[in-house]
Amino acid sequence: MSDKIIIYQVFTRLFGNDRTNCKHNGTKKENGCGHFSDFTLKALQEIKNLGSTHIWYTGVIEHATQTNYEEAGITPDHPAIVKGKAGSPYAIKDYYDIDPDLADKPKERMKEFENLVARTHKAGLKFIIDFVPNHVARQYKSDNKPLDVKDLGEDDNKHHAFNQQNNFYYIPDQLFYPNFDLKQDAPSPYYEMPARATGNDNFSSSPNRNDWYETIKLNYGVDYCGDRQCHFQPTPSTWLKMRDILLYWSSKGIDGFRCDMAEMVPVEFWGWVIPIVKEKYPDIIFIAEVYNPNEYRNYIYNGKFDYLYNKVGLYDTLRGVMCGYTSARQITACWQSVDDIKTHMLNFLENHDEQRIASDFFAKYPEKGKAGLIVSACMSTNPMMIYFGQELGERGMDEEGFSGLDGRTTIFDYWTVDTIRRWRNKGKFDNSLLTDKEKELKAYYSQLLNLCNKETAIKNGEFYDLMYVNESSEHFNADKNYVFIRKSGKELILVIANFEDKDRNIGITLPKHLFDFFEIKEQKQVCGTDLLTGKEEVVSFNSAQRLMTHIPANGGKLLKIEL
């Protein structure tokens, strides 16, 4: 049986930075930067010990930056079209190269990347990178592409707003002229003629600060300004070039792609390219960042994706429950809406786009994420993802530079992540610099995530929602408690999540249908073990009496019962 996938997302540039006093909007020289070499075998083993099966290294491919790497053979970027001193990892400048920030020796960056792949596999982890298919940096230029590869835009007819074989969309005869300064600290202003459409589908020559102005949209054969008509025959040039890029990285031994803004790229492309890649590399997984539930099945069945973000649905609902403005009852509707595709949904409570649980913009306290973690990680066999520092209660409340004080860890700036830096402790990972609360939270995450693969009932078992027979009463708060069963063979786990800020004695109704459904006998009493504490307790296990138990505040219980 395959493992339940547990992904540890890490923002590669920030993980190993040991600087303690970073300057607002500081340069790499001023603030420092983490490297591939910080992911030692010890570091990777520690990440694996958290329960991780995969690690998603975010920001690996070369992207636009304000740091000059001419000595490494890289053309500098104009600062006016780079977000932050370090730059966004989603403004790719060379699909065939590695971000030089991440290398000890920038000229040897590809070799250092290949060593990291080998090291990751040696630690028993699978290796995931980003694939950013919708847009590239405005000054995209591949210095490292194979000799027989033509660059994006190299053969474009720039007189056509849309041409099926163009790689970009043009605004003919118009200068790129956004409503902000195009010079900044450079000797001369950034110049682009004709202007090209931005990555967020702004087809004008004058995007604003809220647009993805640092990127240009890739053309997959959809004429957006011509009633969105599709022109997929003959095969568009962009399809062929992106296929080759996916095959290039697959040949490096990676195990998966997290595909940025996948639904902004036509599903027909995915349905064409993913089988091509899998024919040669059958074990590679494709994860889609998607936000439109109406398109989920389209991107699974026609687009051939393995997994989709479960953001609009479970994440949004759990966030509401954790913050107190959504009833826990709504969790049932979440799984029901994707029940037929549940194995394809990737659950998470944090990632680089979302605010930290412990931030002032979310729940303020990391403990409030415990109950949500129980639900997100344990209710199905589908994958679970956490974001580096989540397991330590990282607050994301720094005002780093381009990224303001927004409850997120910056993806644009050179910075340090306080909790991660102290956990690493210069590579010792001895927990000596962590607070008692951080140690407790880390242990909780590690225990729960490891249970996901240790316990067959969670890893591969069936699911039974108990909320339909547990309405609010003096024994149960259906707005703050969520209960379900996971079962495999003779092992049954009663999972209880408590989103309340106080401990609670609760009574859970077990319906007769539960026993019929699983073909198990009702018993007056059984002995159960809480997998989170190791404590045993005797409880009722029948449809005539409530199962009474005690649950901690902002937490829960996984009561394992041997049938």
What residue ranges belong to the model's regions?
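Short, polar loop/linker segments at the starts of domains and inter-domain junctions
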Residues: 18-37, 361-365, 536-548
